[in-house]
């Protein structure tokens, strides 16, 4: 599991198939003390399901083809040696894993099993799951349109409006995150500069920064929301669950071998992963209309 979202979400290992997130909810009803008792209050156990998708990455590398594109310095001397190993393995695997992690970061938000995109149709992402739940708070009650969009002139008002709509039960939480696309984050940074809110800006804040007036809410730039439907989400980080079938130390498991029969170097990555939220009614969802 990787991408910006995975840095904040709860990682649930051992997910091989549909796996439940067990959610306990209870309330309290005070009564007058006395010699008798009457039971009151309600405790319920509800379940949300992580439905993981099986993901695989397969690639065949022909050293003959690569030798025409890379200098002799990068390729080992000798025809046989060239074929039996990747001379730039560290560079190759680092980039391959980074690309997989970036693609997962996008799928965790934009995934849709009905999508025509191979990178998005392995499991449903949060965009689809939160909308389908139908209980998230509408963060756009004034119906800002797609024609208006997000600008440095309205982004602060949009984010503050979402903060004011946050459910009372989580208003004081210390892990509240406003997930925005990088373009929206840049608009927020520009708005802070235009408004001379420089005391809210610290050096090196390229991925996240606090929301004006709400020190317990962090605005997070998430590349996984790039080229999406441009929704913005306000929720607790602890409300997000990413399911994986491998523990963290094995999450970057890569199998590679040289096949002497095909004279090809083969690479395979295979895993299961999925995502969901525990409390969709504790989310503020902003969608342009």
Regions found by a protein language model. Name each.
Residues 149-196:
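Ordered core of a single globular domain
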């Amino acid at each position: 599991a990787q991408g910006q979202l995975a840095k904040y979400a709860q990682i649930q290992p051992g997910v091989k198939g549909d796996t439940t997130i067990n959610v306990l909810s209870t309330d309290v009803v005070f009564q007058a003390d006395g010699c008798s008792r009457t039971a009151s209050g309600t405790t319920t156990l509800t379940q949300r399901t992580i439905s993981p998708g099986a993901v695989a990455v397969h690639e065949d590398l022909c050293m003959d083809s690569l030798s025409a594109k890379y200098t002799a310095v990068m390729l080992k001397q000798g025809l046989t040696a060239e074929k039996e190993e990747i001379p730039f393995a560290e560079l190759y695997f680092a980039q391959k894993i980074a690309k997989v992690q970036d693609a997962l970061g996008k799928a965790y938000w934009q995934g849709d099993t009905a999508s025509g995109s191979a990178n998005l149709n392995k499991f449903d992402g949060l965009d689809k799951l939160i909308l389908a739940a139908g209980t998230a708070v509408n963060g756009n009650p004034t119906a800002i349109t797609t024609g208006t969009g997000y600008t440095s002139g309205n982004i602060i008002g949009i984010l503050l409006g979402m903060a004011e709509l946050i459910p009372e039960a989580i208003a004081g939480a210390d892990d509240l995150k406003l997930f925005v696309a990088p373009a929206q984050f840049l608009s927020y940074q520009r708005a802070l500069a235009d408004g001379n809110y420089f005391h809210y800006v610290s050096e090196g804040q390229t991925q996240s920064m606090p929301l004006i007036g709400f020190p317990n809410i962090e605005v997070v730039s998430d590349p996984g929301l790039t080229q999406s439907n441009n929704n913005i989400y306000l929720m607790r980080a602890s409300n997000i669950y990413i399911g994986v079938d491998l523990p963290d130390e094995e999450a970057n498991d890569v199998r590679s071998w040289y096949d002497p029969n095909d004279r090809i170097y083969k690479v395979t990555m295979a895993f299961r992963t999925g995502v969901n939220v525990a409390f969709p009614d504790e989310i503020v969802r902003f969608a342009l209309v």
